[in-house]
């Protein structure tokens, strides 16, 4: 689980009434000692994690489903994937189907401009194509949200650029999924009161 060592929620007794949010990026094998391995979870490990939630009778929701609930049930959890890597389809999706678990994937529609991967010498993987996105959505298990237009740190750009990143990314995602885009994730987890207001 991405950043699991940082949060350590499994070491501190927590009420089952609290929803767990599992945040992933790439579900793929590690490559040597490559620095981007921190963003990768091996398919075998992802399978074990999903199996644990399944055997312990946890119920998955998409983000938009969860926020609409009047009362959140015990043992509820959300699975999210940032950036929309192709291995979310090839490696994660079959496992989610096996356990009938739902997930939210946050897309970066503009794959040619400023995607954070392109700034590094190693690319984690390709991104999802439209056909894969629609196949996942049509399964009824996967929801797609926006992760801005170009994966930019929203705290470093002008208000005009910020508004463009939000509006255009929402529009682009909706052009692909043919329905309203209801979910959003902040790139790098960077946001403040002003950015939240714009969102």
Question: Where are each of the predicted segments found?
Answer:
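Secondary-structure boundary/capping motif
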Residues: 87-88, 154
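Noncatalytic alpha-helical scaffolds and linker/capping helices
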Residues: 82-83
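Structural motif corresponding to alpha-helix initiation and N-cap regions
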Residues: 43, 47, 89-90, 127-130, ...
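Metal-dependent polysaccharide deacetylase catalytic core of the NodB/CE4 family, i.e.
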Residues: 22-29, 39, 75-77, 97-192
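N-terminal pre-catalytic segment of deacetylase/amide-hydrolase enzymes
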Residues: 2-77
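Non-membrane alpha-helical structural segments and their capping/turn regions in soluble enzymes
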Residues: 43, 47, 86, 159-164
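A short acidic, amphipathic alpha-helical/loop segment
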Residues: 91-95, 194-198
């Amino acid at each position: 689980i991405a950043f699991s060592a940082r949060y350590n929620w499994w070491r501190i007794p927590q009420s089952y009434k609290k929803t767990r949010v599992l945040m992933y990026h790439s579900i793929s094998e590690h490559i040597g000692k490559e620095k981007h391995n921190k963003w990768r979870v091996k398919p075998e490990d992802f399978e074990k994690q999903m199996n644990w939630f399944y055997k312990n009778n946890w119920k998955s929701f998409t983000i938009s489903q969860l926020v609409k609930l009047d009362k959140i049930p015990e043992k509820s959890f959300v699975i999210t994937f940032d950036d929309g890597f192709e291995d979310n389809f090839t490696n994660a999706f079959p496992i989610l189907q096996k356990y009938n678990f739902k997930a939210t994937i946050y897309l970066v529609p503009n794959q040619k401009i400023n995607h954070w991967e392109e700034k590094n010498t190693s690319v984690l993987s390709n991104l999802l194509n439209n056909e894969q996105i629609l196949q996942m959505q049509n399964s009824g298990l996967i929801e797609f949200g926006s992760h801005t237009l170009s994966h930019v740190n929203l705290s470093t750009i002008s208000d005009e650029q910020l508004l463009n990143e939000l509006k255009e990314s929402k529009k682009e995602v909706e052009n692909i999924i043919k329905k309203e885009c209801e979910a959003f994730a902040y790139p790098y987890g960077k946001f403040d009161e002003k950015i939240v207001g714009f969102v």
